[in-house]
């Protein structure tokens, strides 16, 4: 018999909001009686953009900006309909991107 599993991937630029959201999901799943694996921290993506400070010349004067994307993975094993319903009604902050796979 195969076990059913819900895999949730969370992405955010701010790691504190991401960890709070992951904790809310874990608490909600555990109170409804499902087994939870995670949150597992995935590697952080770092995008670096280099631009020239001056408009025309002065190529030696540059500025670098970076944005980091933090990620977490949560697996919910053998979810009940009560678990799925509780997760659907969960309110999470706007800065968190959620991908759910069944």
Swiss-Prot record:
The gene is rpsJ. One of its GO terms (molecular function) is tRNA binding. Keywords: Ribonucleoprotein, Ribosomal protein. It comes from the Bacteria. Pfam families: Ribosomal_S10 (PF00338). One of its GO terms (biological process) is translation. This is Small ribosomal subunit protein uS10. SUPFAM superfamilies: Ribosomal protein S10 (SSF54999). The keyword Ribosomal protein applies. InterPro entries: Ribosomal_uS10, Ribosomal_uS10_CS, Ribosomal_uS10_dom, Ribosomal_uS10_dom_sf. Part of the 30S ribosomal subunit. Involved in the binding of tRNA to the ribosomes. Belongs to the universal ribosomal protein uS10 family. One of its GO terms (cellular component) is ribosome.
């Amino acid at each position: 018999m195969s076990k059913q599993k819900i895999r949730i991937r969370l992405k955010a630029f701010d790691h504190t909001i991401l960890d709070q959201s992951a904790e809310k999901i874990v608490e909600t799943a555990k109170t409804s009686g499902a087994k939870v694996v995670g949150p597992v921290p995935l590697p952080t993506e770092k995008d670096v953009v280099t631009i020239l400070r001056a408009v025309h010349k002065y190529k030696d004067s540059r500025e670098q900006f970076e944005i980091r994307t933090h990620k977490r993975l949560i697996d919910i094993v053998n979810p009940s309909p009560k678990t799925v319903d509780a997760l659907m009604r969960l309110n999470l902050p706007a800065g968190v991107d959620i991908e759910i796979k069944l």
